[in-house]
Amino acid sequence: MARYTGAVCRLCRREGLKLFLKGDRCYTDKCAFTRRGYAPGVHGQSRKKISNYGLQLREKQKAKRIYGVLEKQFRIYYKRAERIKGISGENLLKLLELRLDNVAYKLGYGSSRKEARQLVTHGHFLVNGKKVDIPSYTLKVNEVVSVSEKSRGTEKFKTFAENPKTLPAWIEANYDNFEAKIVAEPNREDIDTPIKETLIVELYSK
């Protein structure tokens, strides 16, 4: 699958907020958005008034960039969200949050979702004891994510385990055993991603 290979800092500047696409660098003075918090391009410093459609489109682009999902896959997620009982926008965010690469990132295995995605692709993780190297794999309640025995001995994963993150209520982790369990589906209040999902629903409802 094709991936965006350009300067990711431009994406943050385009959206007008930090998307934390470069991990630890985003928290330092080296962050391009900290130094130039306006849109890229010649007219970047003079932001024009955006139409309702433009706001809806920007919100969709923001969600795609945060979770590292391309257009075709994002549209599939939305169609799945519509078929699930409940509010479509919240269902969409739940599906994105339950991606294996996102859960790996939430657990602290990677300073960014991009790094976590690479770790998944390289086969470092198991789901219910079986290797899963598909970043988009949707985790289900009661499934257990663990680090492979081989990877546990590496300095990278030892460092990750020694610096655990504060986890949302729907994930329980045992860093001593390099394991985590999905104990519930994420509620909207558990999702701290700066996305206005109602705008995305409005866009796809046209």
Curated annotation (Swiss-Prot):
CDD domains: S4. One of its GO terms (cellular component) is small ribosomal subunit. The keyword Ribosomal protein applies. The keyword Metal-binding does not apply. GO terms for biological process: ribosomal small subunit biogenesis; translation. GO terms for molecular function: rRNA binding; structural constituent of ribosome. It comes from the Bacteria. SMART domains: Ribosomal_S4 (SM01390), S4 (SM00363). Residues 98-164 form the S4 RNA-binding domain. Keywords: Ribonucleoprotein, Ribosomal protein, RNA-binding, rRNA-binding. PROSITE patterns: S4. Gene3D superfamilies: Ribosomal Protein S4 Delta 41, Chain A, domain 1, RNA-binding S4 domain. Belongs to the universal ribosomal protein uS4 family. PANTHER family: 30S 40S RIBOSOMAL PROTEIN, SMALL RIBOSOMAL SUBUNIT PROTEIN US4M. One of the primary rRNA binding proteins, it binds directly to 16S rRNA where it nucleates assembly of the body of the 30S subunit. Part of the 30S ribosomal subunit. Contacts protein S5. The interaction surface between S4 and S5 is involved in control of translational fidelity. HAMAP family: Ribosomal_uS4_B. This is Small ribosomal subunit protein uS4A. It comes from Clostridium acetobutylicum (strain ATCC 824 / DSM 792 / JCM 1419 / IAM 19013 / LMG 5710 / NBRC 13948 / NRRL B-527 / VKM B-1787 / 2291 / W). The lineage of its organism: Bacteria, Bacillati, Bacillota, Clostridia, Eubacteriales. The gene is rspD1.
